[in-house]
UniProtKB/Swiss-Prot annotation:
Ranges of residues in domain v-SNARE coiled-coil homology: 1087-1147
Membrane topology: Peripheral membrane protein
Name of the protein in question: Syntaxin-binding protein 5
UniProt main location, coarse: cytoplasm
Composition bias, Basic and acidic residues: 879-893
WD repeats: 62-95, 102-141, 146-182, 201-235, 241-273, 295-337, 345-379, 401-478, 506-620, 634-696, 795-852, 861-935, 940-984, 998-1021
Record family assignment: Belongs to the WD repeat L(2)GL family.
Lineage, opening ranks: Eukaryota, Metazoa, Chordata, Craniata, Vertebrata
C-alpha cells in the first residue's frame, strides 16, 4: 500500500512545483483575474485504504462447522474464504492465502480456535480470540491427500484421514505430526487383496475414547483399538459409504450408502447390520429388495431423553423423481418429514444442547448450508418451521446489476424505510430466537446513517441499513409490478431489447432529502417513484413514450488538436436489411411494415394497488423508431426541486417534467453542439419519407401540446452583453427549433394519438445485443480519439445545479450540465415558473446555453463548489406526504411544495465565483465560473482509465475519489486537485466490479466482490484507526457445561465413558517422531497479527482496569471516611461512658 507520505517533502518544493501551474494559470487568466487561493484542509495523512467488512452469502460454499458452546457458525468456500457468524451483527471474513477450496472445518470447542482443511492438503489453525482472526500454524502434507479430519471434544490430537486410507495424528497445539500412524493394510482384513479406498469418516466411540471408528469409501468400517494398535471389529457392506454417525451410548452406529440405504450396526455384531432402511425407496412385493435410490450424502443420529431419536439425512431420493428439488429428510419415530430446499444441499449440521457426545443430544435445530442460501430449521415445533434469518444473505436473491452508496443520510430515512419494509415480512417463521448468538458487538464510533441501494436483474430494488459496518435489509421495491407479464414465451412481444431479465435495473438516481427515486431499466424504460406512508390505488398509471433516434451520415476532420471520429449509421449495429413484419400492419408500424412507436414493455391498464413505500409517479419508455429498437439508457438524473428528470443514451437526451407529465426536451447529441460541432457531422435519415423528422431535429414528443416558445432561451430577449458569436449561434438554434415546432405540431399530435393506444405487435426482428452495456463499451485510448472506435456519442453524465451558464452571467440560475463519452460538457438553461401554482400551470422553458467545455475521455462525474471550496449540493424539495386526504383540495398540495435551494448559499454574495469540478476517464478539471477558465487540471491516468469518480465529503472538506481499471484508488484535493492517495488495490477482473464500485461520503466505498457478496472499504485514516474497536468479537469467555453424571452403578461397574491418555499414547516419548518428508510445518503470521489485533484490546483492558482501580480507590476512600467516622463515634462514646462511670463510682446500689 503506497501513500503520498512524501507530500511533506514536496511541500518544501511548492514554490518550484507550483510555478509551472502558475505559469499555466497566467496563460489561462490575465494577471488581474488570478483565481483566489482557497485554504485546503485535507492532507495525505487523512487517507488510508483498508477493507472493513464483507456482507452477503459466502460465494460457492463448501464446508460447515459449529461451536455449540460459543454459538459460532463457520462456513468455508471453494475459493478459500472463511466466514464466521455469531449473533446478528457479528460477522467476520477471512481468506486463506492459497485460495484452495475448504473441504472441512473443525472447531476447538470453546477454545477460540478453528482448524481448516484445504484441497491442497494443508491444515491451518486459526486464532479466533482476536477481532481479525489469523493463522497460527499450518501443516502441509507432501505425500498424501487429506480427505477427512476429526477432533474429539476437549482433545488436542487431530485425526487426519487420507486418500491412501491411512490416518495420521496431529497435535493442534504445536501443529506437529505424531509418530503414531494407522496404516490401511493393518486396519482391514489381512486376507483382503483390494484397497479399501479413501478414509471418509473418523470418530471415537462416545463411551470409549480408545476405540476409533474408521469408515472407508468402499464400504468397509473398522473399529480400531488405539492402545493395542489393532482392529477389534470389521464391518463390511456391498455399497460405498458416504458418512457414519454414532448413537450416544456407543453401542450402535449408522452408515449412509451410495444406493440410498441406511444401515444400523451393533458394535459387537459385525457380520450384518441390525437394520437396513431405504427412506425413499418403494417397497416391492414378495419381500424383494427396494429399488436403489440416489446416494445419501450425509446422515446424523441424535437422541432425546423423552422420545425417539432423530435420524436426519440429505439425499437418498428415488431416481424417478426427476426435477424434484433437493430435500432434507427428518425421521423421528414413525414420522418422516421431507423438507424441500430451493438449492442443492452442500452440508448440514444438527444443533444440540450438549457438546458431549456421550450424553443425550437433545437436538433443537438443523443448519442447512445450501448452494446459495443458509437455512435453519426448528426441530422443536410441529411442521419444522424455519427461523427468520437475521444475516444479510439475500443480496443475490436476484443478481445485483448496480449499487449506490449514501453515507450521512437524513436521520429520519432509515426509520421511515424500516416502517414500510416491516409490513413486507413473510409469516410462518419459528417463534424462537435465532440460536446462533455468539460473540459481542463492537463499539461503533460512527453514528451517521448509511444506506446502500442495490438494483437487481428481476427489476427489484433493495434498501439496506449499512450504519456502523452492519447490514440489514430495510425495504424492497418491485419495479416490474407496473408492467404486464407474458404468460408464456409465445405470448411475449418480440420488442424486447433483451431476451432475459427485461426489467433489470441499470441506473439508480435517488434524492435522500425528498425521497424521490428514479430508475432506468434495461428495456429503455424510466420509472419515477414518490415515497408515501399511505396506501393508494392508482386507477391509471401515468406514462409517456418518447421517440429518440438520430442518425449521422459523414464525419469530416475538424481543424484543431482533436482528430475526427469514424462514424457508422446509428440505430442498429448491423447493416442487414430489416425483415418485413409477418403480422398485419397497424398504427404501430410504419408504412413498409417496420415496427414503429412500440415500447419494449407494456404498462398495466388496470388499477394498481400501491402499498406504503415507493409508489409509481410516472413511467417513461423509449419506443422503436422505424424498425430500430431504442438504445439502452446510459445516464440519468432527477431533481425534486425542479420537478424534472433527464436521461440520455447513444442517440441523444430527453428531459421530462414529471409534475406536468410532459416531455420538455428531446434532442440528439449533435443538436446540442449546434453549429459548434467540431466533427462536422451531417444528419441524415434514410426514412425521411416515413418520418418527417426535419433537417436535424428529432421529434419533440411531449405529453401535451406545448407552445412553440417552449425551447426559447430565457435570455434571448434581454440586452445583456453576451458574446456576439455565441448569441448568434444560440439565436439561430432557437429559430431552428421554433420552425420545426410549427412544421411538426400536427405530426406530434398524431404521434401522441398513436402512443396513447400503446399497441405492441410481435415481430421476427431480434435486437442486436452487441451494445448491451453502452456505459462500458467505450474505447480506452489516451485522447478524445477514443470515439474512433465507436459509432456514436452517448450521454455519460448529467447534473442539475444552480450556477453561471454563460461567461457574462452576473448571477447563477438553474441549469443542467451534460457530459458525453467524447469528453464534451454542455450547459442547458432552465427557466422555471415562479411559485408553486404557476409551476403546475406554466411550462418549463429549456434551451442550450451555447457553453461547451472539453476534456479527454468520457465524462463520468460533475459537481460544483462555492467560492470557499465547499460542495454545493443540488436544490431539493423536502419530503412531505403527497397522498393527502380527499377532503383537502389541490391548493393544499400546492402549499406543500417547498423547494429548497442550497446553491448558492445564503451567505455567499451573488458576485462571488463558483467552481465546476469535472472528472473524465482520463483527467479532472476545475473550471472557474462564470469566467469558464480552467483553474486547475490533473491528468489522472495515461495508460488506464477511470471507472468511477465521485466528489465526496470527508472531514469537513471535499475531495475527488477515483477508481481506475488498473486497480488504483486515488484521491485528489479540491479545488487544487493535489494527489492525496494512490494505492494499488484491485485490478478490473470483470464487469461486475466496474458496474458496482462506488464511493460515498465520510471515506466509505463498496463494490460487489462476488455474485453474492458486497465488500466495503474505507479510505479514511480515522475510520481505519477506529476499525478495531468497531469490529465485533467472536470469542467470549463461557463456562464449559458440566460433563454428564456417570451414575453410581456405572461408575462402580465400569459402564460409563472410558477416558484415554492421548498424550501418553501419541506423544513423542511413546510413538516417536513422524517422518519429516510426510508433512511440512509452516508457522503462521497469527502470532504477530495476534499481538497487533490485541493491541487495542489491551489498551481497552487497561482502560477498564484503570477505571475499576479508580472505582476501587473511591470505594476505599469512602470506607476510610466511614471508618474515621466510626472511630470518632467510638471515642465520643468512650468519653461519655467514662464520665458516667466517674459520676456513679462511689454511690451504693440503693442510692440509684
Amino acid at each position: 500500500m503506497r501513500k503520498f507520505n512524501i507530500r511533506k517533502v514536496l511541500d518544501g518544493l511548492t514554490a518550484g512545483s507550483s510555478s509551472a501551474s502558475q505559469q499555466q494559470q497566467q496563460q489561462q487568466h490575465p494577471p488581474g483575474n488570478r483565481e483566489p487561493e482557497i485554504q485546503e484542509t485535507l492532507q495525505s495523512e487523512h487517507f488510508q485504504l483498508c477493507k472493513t467488512v464483507r456482507h452477503g452469502f459466502p460465494y460457492q460454499p463448501s464446508a460447515l462447522a459449529f461451536d455449540p458452546v460459543q454459538k459460532i457458525l463457520a462456513v468455508g468456500t471453494q475459493t478459500g474464504a472463511l466466514r464466521l457468524f455469531g449473533r446478528p451483527g457479528v460477522e467476520c471474513y477471512c481468506q486463506h492465502d492459497s485460495g484452495a477450496a475448504v473441504i472441512q472445518l473443525q472447531f476447538l470447542i470453546n477454545e477460540g480456535a478453528l482448524v481448516s482443511a484445504l484441497a491442497d492438503d494443508t491444515l491451518h489453525l486459526w486464532n479466533l480470540r482476536q477481532k481479525r482472526p489469523a493463522v497460527l500454524h499450518s501443516l502441509k502434507f507432501c505425500r498424501e491427500r487429506v480427505t477427512f479430519c476429526h477432533l474429539p471434544f476437549q482433545s488436542k490430537w487431530l485425526y487426519v484421514g487420507t486418500e491412501r486410507g491411512n490416518i495420521h495424528i496431529v497435535n493442534v497445539e504445536s501443529f506437529t505430526l505424531s509418530g503414531y500412524v494407522i496404516m490401511w493394510n493393518k486396519a482391514i482384513e489381512l486376507s483382503s487383496k483390494s484397497h479399501p479406498g479413501p478414509v471418509v469418516h473418523i470418530s471415537d466411540n462416545p463411551m470409549d475414547e480408545g476405540k476409533l471408528l474408521i469408515g472407508f469409501e468402499s464400504g468397509t468400517v473398522v473399529l480400531w483399538d488405539l492402545k493395542s494398535k489393532k482392529a477389534d471389529y470389521r464391518y463390511t457392506y456391498d455399497e460405498a459409504i458416504h458418512s457414519v454417525a454414532w448413537h450416544h451410548e456407543g453401542k450402535q452406529f449408522i452408515c449412509s450408502h451410495s444406493d440410498g440405504t441406511l444401515t444400523i450396526w451393533n458394535v459387537r455384531s459385525p457380520t450384518k447390520p441390525v437394520q437396513t432402511i431405504t427412506p425413499h425407496g418403494k417397497q416391492l412385493k414378495d419381500g424383494k429388495k427396494p429399488e436403489p435410490c440416489k446416494p445419501i450424502l450425509k446422515v446424523e443420529f441424535k437422541t432425546t431423553r423423552s422420545g425417539e431419536p432423530f435420524i436426519i439425512l440429505s439425499g437418498g431420493l428415488s431416481y424417478d423423481t426427476v426435477g424434484r428439488r433437493p430435500c432434507l429428510t427428518v425421521m423421528h419415530g414413525k414420522s418422516t418429514a421431507v423438507l424441500e430446499m430451493d438449492y442443492s444441499i452442500v452440508d448440514f449440521l444438527t444443533l444440540c444442547e450438549t457438546p458431549y457426545p456421550n450424553d443425550f443430544q437433545e437436538p433443537y435445530a438443523v443448519v442447512v448450508l445450501l448452494e446459495k442460501d443458509l437455512v435453519l430449521i426448528d426441530l422443536a415445533q410441529n411442521g419444522y418451521p424455519i427461523f427468520e434469518n437475521p444475516y444479510p444473505l439475500s443480496i443475490h436473491e436476484s443478481p445485483v446489476t448496480c449499487c449506490e452508496y449514501f453515507a450521512d443520510c437524513p436521520v429520519d430515512l432509515i426509520p421511515a424505510l424500516y416502517s414500510v419494509g416491516a409490513r413486507q415480512k413473510r409469516q410462518g417463521y419459528s417463534k424462537k430466537e435465532w440460536p446462533i448468538n455468539g460473540g459481542n458487538w463492537g463499539l461503533g464510533a460512527q453514528s451517521y446513517p448509511e444506506i446502500i441501494i442495490t438494483g437487481h436483474a428481476d427489476g427489484s430494488i433493495k434498501f439496506w441499513d449499512a450504519s456502523a459496518i452492519t447490514l440489514q435489509v430495510l425495504y424492497k421495491l418491485k419495479t416490474s409490478k407496473v408492467f404486464e407479464k407474458s404468460r408464456n414465451k409465445d405470448d411475449r412481444q418480440n420488442t424486447d431489447i433483451v431476451d432475459e431479465d427485461p426489467y433489470a435495473i441499470q441506473i439508480i438516481s435517488w434524492c435522500p432529502e425528498s425521497r424521490m427515486l428514479c430508475i432506468a431499466g434495461v428495456s429503455a424504460h424510466v420509472i419515477i417513484y414518490r415515497f408515501s406512508k399511505q396506501e393508494v390505488v392508482t386507477e391509471v398509471i401515468p406514462m409517456l413514450e418518447v421517440r429518440l433516434l438520430y442518425e449521422i451520415n459523414d464525419v469530416e476532420t475538424p481543424e484543431g488538436e482533436q482528430p475526427p471520429p469514424l462514424s457508422t449509421p446509428v440505430g442498429s449495429s448491423t447493416s442487414q436489411p430489416i425483415p418485413p413484419q409477418s403480422h398485419p400492419s397497424t398504427s404501430s408500424s410504419s408504412s413498409d411494415g417496420l415496427r414503429d412507436n412500440v415500447p419494449c414493455l407494456k404498462v398495466k391498464n388496470s388499477p394498481l394497488k400501491q402499498s406504503p413505500g415507493y409508489q409509481t409517479e410516472l413511467v417513461i419508455q423509449l419506443v422503436w423508431v422505424g424498425g430500430e429498437p431504442p438504445q439502452q439508457i446510459t445516464s440519468l438524473a432527477l431533481n425534486s426541486s425542479y420537478g424534472l428528470v433527464v436521461f440520455g443514451n447513444s442517440n441523444g437526451i430527453a428531459m421530462v417534467d414529471y409534475l406536468q407529465k410532459a416531455v420538455l426536451l428531446n434532442l440528439s447529441t449533435i443538436e446540442l453542439y449546434g453549429s459548434n460541432d467540431p466533427y462536422r457531422r451531417e444528419p441524415r435519415s434514410p426514412r425521411k419519407s416515413r418520418q418527417p423528422s426535419g433537417a436535424g431535429l428529432c421529434d419533440i414528443t411531449e405529453g401535451t401540446v406545448v407552445p412553440e416558445d417552449r425551447c426559447k432561451s430565457p435570455t434571448s430577449g434581454s440586452s445583456s452583453p453576451h458574446n456576439s458569436d455565441d448569441e448568434q449561434k444560440v439565436n439561430n438554434f432557437i429559430e431552428k427549433v421554433k420552425t420545426q415546432s410549427r412544421k411538426f405540431s400536427k405530426m406530434v399530435a398524431s404521434d401522441l394519438a398513436k402512443m396513447s393506444r400503446k399497441l405492441s405487435l410481435p415481430t421476427d426482428l431480434k435486437p442486436d445485443l452487441d451494445v448491451k452495456d453502452n456505459s462500458f463499451s467505450r474505447s480506452r485510448s489516451s485522447s478524445v480519439t477514443s470515439i474512433d472506435k465507436e459509432s456514436r456519442e452517448a450521454i455519460s453524465a448529467l447534473h442539475f445545479c444552480e450556477t453561471f451558464t454563460r461567461k457574462a452571467d452576473s448571477s447563477p440560475s438553474p441549469c443542467l450540465w451534460v457530459g458525453t463519452t467524447v469528453g464534451t460538457a454542455f450547459v442547458i438553461t432552465l427557466n422555471l415558473p415562479l411559485g408553486p401554482e404557476q409551476r403546475l400551470l406554466q411550462p418549463v422553458i429549456v434551451s442550450p446555453s451555447g457553453t461547451i467545455l472539453r476534456l479527454k475521455g468520457a465524462i463520468l462525474r460533475m459537481a460544483f463548489l462555492d467560492a470557499a471550496g465547499c460542495l454545493m449540493p443540488p436544490a431539493y424539495e423536502p419530503w412531505t406526504e403527497h397522498n393527502v386526504p380527499e377532503e383537502k383540495d389541490e391548493k393544499e398540495k400546492l402549499k406543500k411544495r417547498r423547494p429548497v435551494s442550497v446553491s448558492p448559499s445564503s451567505s455567499q454574495e451573488i458576485s462571488e465565483n463558483q467552481y465546476a469540478v469535472i472528472c473524465s476517464e482520463k483527467q479532472a478539471k476545475v473550471i472557474s465560473l462564470p469566467t469558464q477558465n480552467c483553474a486547475y487540471k490533473q491528468n489522472i491516468t495515461e495508460t488506464s482509465f477511470v471507472l468511477r469518480g465521485d466528489i465526496v465529503a470527508l472531514s469537513n472538506s471535499v475531495c475527488l475519489a477515483c477508481f481506475c481499471a488498473n486497480g488504483h484508488i486515488m484521491t485528489f484535493s479540491l479545488p487544487s486537485l493535489r494527489p492525496l492517495l494512490d494505492v494499488y488495490y484491485l485490478p478490473l477482473t470483470n464487469m461486475r466490479i466496474a458496474r458496482t464500485f462506488c464511493f460515498a461520503n465520510s471515506g466509505q466505498a463498496l463494490y460487489l466482490v462476488s455474485p453474492t457478496e458486497i465488500q466495503r472499504l474505507t479510505y479514511s485514516q480515522e475510520t481505519c484507526e477506529n476499525l478495531q474497536e468497531m469490529l465485533g468479537e467472536l470469542f467470549t469467555p463461557v463456562e464449559t457445561p458440566e460433563a454428564p453424571n456417570r451414575g453410581f452403578f456405572k461408575g462402580l461397574f465400569g459402564g460409563g465413558a472410558q477416558s484415554l491418555d492421548r498424550e501418553e499414547l501419541f506423544g513423542e516419548s511413546s510413538s516417536g517422531k513422524a517422518s519429516r518428508s510426510l508433512a511440512q510445518h509452516i508457522p503462521g503470521p497469527g502470532g504477530i497479527e495476534g499481538v497487533k489485533g490485541a493491541a487495542s484490546g489491551v489498551v481497552g483492558e487497561l482502560a477498564r482496569a484503570r477505571l475499576a482501580l479508580d472505582e476501587r480507590g473511591q470505594k476505599l476512600s469512602d470506607l476510610e471516611e466511614r471508618t474515621a467516622a466510626m472511630m470518632s463515634s467510638a471515642d465520643s462514646f468512650s468519653k461519655h461512658a467514662h464520665e458516667m462511670m466517674l459520676k456513679y463510682k462511689d454511690k451504693k446500689w440503693y442510692q440509684f
